[in-house]
Regions:
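Helix-rich catalytic cores of soluble enzyme domains
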Residues: 114-346
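Metallocofactor- and cofactor-centric catalytic cores in central/energy metabolism, strongly enriched
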Residues: 1-193, 197-213, 346
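Short acidic/histidine-rich active-site segments
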Residues: 348-351
């Protein structure tokens, strides 16, 4: 949807500058823990500062700017038929569904059950017919297939039931390789897929300030094969991040910038989205509250942070604390989507 709403800016220019400077200071003085010796070696060769004793990588400001500048500010998430291509970085807000749930409300029984492969097909079919949803994020984990073939089956069924772009969360290297082989077969070859990739991958660093070797290898494989990726930190205020919203944003921004920069070190020019999935913890009851208003505020702020660097952003909205599709659900989903959309996010997932 083109932006036709007055902008919502939770951060003043002064606040925006302060958070960005603090995040860069975190990367320069504290650093990111990299759990993989080969990637420590790669980053050292690229000029990053390495502390082998605690596997920390620190980034000087000039070094960071050099590699952030290599990330494209615009690219396309292609559909298979060319009718629903998603152009990122052009000032248009796109919505996508949420992904990788493990339980679903069964409309036949009214109760919850584990998700199955048929649910991937059903949700992909639904998204294929929804004009307001620009692409399909693999919605659930199929529990009726062998774990070794989760990603292969998920992507196969998704691509079978929608012609829109398919994005999926991948958490193991073998699964990414299987998905890549499948997509190349469908595209007609490696170069055909590289030219117009109709699949993309979501990966997540570990908050606080850690990226494991598995995630780094996934980012490298995708980047080197032209597959768009997002390295989306998901810090939780009061749990895996500071209790203040500003503190959480500083940490999230540092993690997101590190993800973009490291991806460019491993795969120069890789199509990478600045990712943001910040949320909160109800510290009275130790409950994860993704549907809180603070979550929407932080995601709107994340858009401002991404646009400081002219990066397309994968943000979050459309979430709720309701347990049923009721008026609470509708209200919370509407306003979290609206707050992030009014700041011009390129892609809002969980919508």
């Amino acid at each position: 949807m083109p932006m036709g709403l007055p902008p919502y800016r939770p951060l003043s220019p002064e606040d925006l500058k302060k958070i960005d400077q603090t995040s860069r200071l975190i990367l320069e003085r504290v650093g990111i823990r990299i759990l993989g010796q080969n990637y420590l070696d790669i980053l050292k060769a690229a000029g990053a500062i390495i502390d082998q004793s605690d596997q920390k990588v620190r980034f000087e400001s000039a070094w960071l700017d050099e590699f952030l500048a290599r990330a494209p500010s615009q690219f396309v998430l292609y559909s298979r038929d060319g009718k629903n291509d998603v152009h990122l970085g052009e000032g248009v807000v796109h919505f996508a569904n949420g992904g990788r749930v493990f339980r679903i409300l069964d409309m036949g029984t009214g109760g919850y059950r584990l998700t199955m492969l048929r649910d991937v097909a059903h949700t992909a079919t639904l998204v294929n017919h929804l004009k307001n949803i620009s692409l399909y994020i693999i919605a659930c984990q199929a529990h009726d297939v062998e774990p070794h073939y989760y990603h292969l089956n998920d992507f196969y069924h998704a691509l079978n039931f929608t012609s829109k772009h398919v994005m999926g969360g991948c958490d193991d290297v073998e699964g990414v390789k299987q998905m890549l082989a499948l997509a190349q077969l469908i595209a007609g070859g490696e170069e055909e897929l590289r030219e117009k990739p109709f699949v993309s991958v979501i990966s997540n660093p570990i908050s606080p300030l850690t990226i494991d070797a598995n995630t780094l290898e996934i980012l490298t494989i995708c980047g080197s094969n032209g597959i768009p990726v997002t390295c989306a930190p998901a810090p939780i205020s009061g749990a895996t991040a500071p209790a203040t919203l500003a503190g959480t944003l500083c940490q999230m921004h540092a993690e997101a910038l590190a993800g973009v920069a490291i991806t460019q070190v491993c795969s120069p020019g890789a199509k990478v989205l600045y990712g943001a999935v910040p949320s909160t913890m109800d510290m009275r009851h130790m409950e994860y509250t993704m549907g809180s208003v603070e979550m929407a505020i932080m995601n709107a702020a994340a858009v401002q942070l991404a646009k400081l660097y002219d990066f397309p952003i994968y943000a979050s909205g459309g979430v709720t604390e309701a347990k049923r599709p009721d008026i609470q659900s509708g209200c919370e989903k509407t306003f979290s989507n609206l707050m992030v959309a009014m700041n011009g996010a390129d892609l809002i997932h969980l919508a």
